From Swiss-Prot:
Domain Tyr recombinase, chain residue ranges per copy: 84-246
Recorded family membership: Belongs to the 'phage' integrase family. XerD-like subfamily.
Pfam families, A to Z: Phage_integrase (PF00589)
Occurrences of domain Core-binding (CB) (ranges): 1-72
Organism of this sequence: Streptococcus agalactiae serotype III (strain NEM316)
Main location per the UniProt record: cytoplasm
Catalytic residues identified in the record: K149, R212, Y244 (o-(3'-phospho-dna)-tyrosine intermediate)
A cellular-component GO term for this protein: cytoplasm
Entry-linked InterPro entries: CB, DNA_brk_join_enz, Integrase-like_cat_sf, Integrase_catalytic, Tyrosine_recombinase_XerD-like
Subcellular location(s) per record: Cytoplasm
The protein, known as: Tyrosine recombinase XerD-like
Signal peptide residues on this chain, from the entry's feature table: none
Function summary: Putative tyrosine recombinase. Not involved in the cutting and rejoining of the recombining DNA molecules on dif(SL) site.
Keywords per UniProt: Cytoplasm, DNA integration, DNA recombination, DNA-binding
Amino acid sequence: MINDINNFIESKKLSLNSRKSYHYDLKQFYKIIGGHVNSEKLALYQQSLSEFKLTARKRKLSAVNQFLFFLYNRGTLKEFYRLQETEKITLTQTKSQIMDLSNFYQDTDYPSGRLIALLILSLGLTPAEIANLKKADFDTTFNILSIEKSQMKRILKLPENLLPFLLESLEEDGDLVFEHNGKPYSRQWFFNQLTDFLNEKNEQQLTAQLLREQFILKQKENGKTMTELSRLLGLKTPITLERYYR
């Protein structure tokens, strides 16, 4: 299995730090299961994660699930296994608390899904707005995005941690940020890309709407008033934001 771990890591385009992280987590996984994958061994491994914090557990589960899929895809495993996080964040918690989603900025097999998630999380955009984003809407000199919708124009500041992932997409051919043969992708494509990315990060409970809610909570924490936030979101009225300011 050690060779399988090395082959798996080599198959992914990872930074040095990410390679070390994957290797450490999967080596730990190997030691616990003894190189044999079955339901009992996986249950034993999952039990061993109880001592770790939720963020660390999610990282380890993500690495192991990707590795298990790799083994299944190659035919090494005859049965498909997938570990689930037992301590799920409830919908109530998601609505009321800012989540630690720093793993969204790490390596992924779904770069389009990651960019969609980060555009929602960082700018509060809806999937429909993202689907219509033109590269000309971005000013990379001043790091701003201009969006015009329903005769309302808003200027959004691009966060520094979003730029590396965004610039990579802006350098590709085409007028739209996301397009195929000059045409925008379907709504189902955006949904699938985002879902695949969220599954990879063990955040299956999240949706585009809940990611947008994270943007709202963060902006409120940063001191934005209800009126200011409604302008950032392109809302005609701030009424729908009232519940966040009670």
